[in-house]
Regions:
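Low-complexity, intrinsically disordered terminal/linker segments enriched in charged
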Residues: 137-169
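Short, aromatic-enriched amphipathic alpha-helices that serve as compact interaction elements
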Residues: 26-45
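Solvent-exposed loop/turn segments at secondary-structure junctions
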Residues: 57-59, 65-68, 112-116, 140-144
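Short, well-ordered alpha-helical segments enriched in acidic and aromatic residues
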Residues: 44-57, 61
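Bacterial N-terminal signal peptides
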Residues: 6-16
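Surface-exposed, charged secondary-structure patches
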Residues: 20-23, 30, 60, 73-119, ...
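A short, structured loop/turn motif at beta-sheet edges
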Residues: 97-104, 126-134
Length: 169
């Protein structure tokens, strides 16, 4: 009898773990679909759709150290690009998604192919809402090969000094 009860208990626990794994895989696909649609909206210069994927308190971190924007600040920055009929084009090459145990938060990182910036990396956090997954934070970066870091470090430091010495009094 103990063996039967133990086997039943193990079967129940195992089925719950398997169901959660399937559910997490489904949620990961949903997050991926949101990100793909978000990138497609930028490529199509669909400003309304693009910004509908952001949470109201979202933050966008751009490639420049000065680029930390709320959703609304980023929209003001990006509006001229969308208004011209072509914003930007990011294609996810690889993507990894992790779903939090409470299934209300997901984080990801993705390698991106872009025609204007070259290889990039996007990472961020999405939150589950009654309207679906929303981007709470997105960080766009340009990976620098380790062998080039010293060169870029010097150029960035020099750029900062050059900008500070060229400021009007």
């Amino acid at each position: 009898m103990k063996r039967v009860l133990c086997a039943i208990f193990i079967a129940i626990v195992a089925s719950g773990v398997a169901a959660q794994s399937v559910d997490n895989a489904s949620m990961s696909r949903d997050v991926g679909a949101v990100l793909d649609a978000w990138h497609a909206a930028a490529d199509a210069a669909d400003e309304e759709k693009y910004f509908s994927y952001f949470a109201s308190d979202a933050v966008f971190l751009g490639t420049d150290a000065t680029e930390r924007w709320t959703r609304d600040e980023f929209r003001r920055f990006a509006h001229p690009y969308f208004a011209k009929g072509k914003a930007w084009s990011f294609k996810s090459v690889t993507r990894w998604v992790t779903i939090a145990p409470d299934r209300k938060v997901a984080w990801f990182d993705e390698a991106l192919a872009t025609p204007h910036l070259g290889p990039c990396r996007g990472s961020g956090v999405l939150v589950a809402t009654s309207a679906g997954w929303k981007i709470a934070q997105y960080n766009l970066s340009i990976p620098i090969p380790n062998d080039l870091v010293d060169e870029f470090k010097k150029r960035i430091e020099g750029f900062g000094k050059e900008k500070s010495t060229n400021k009007a009094p």
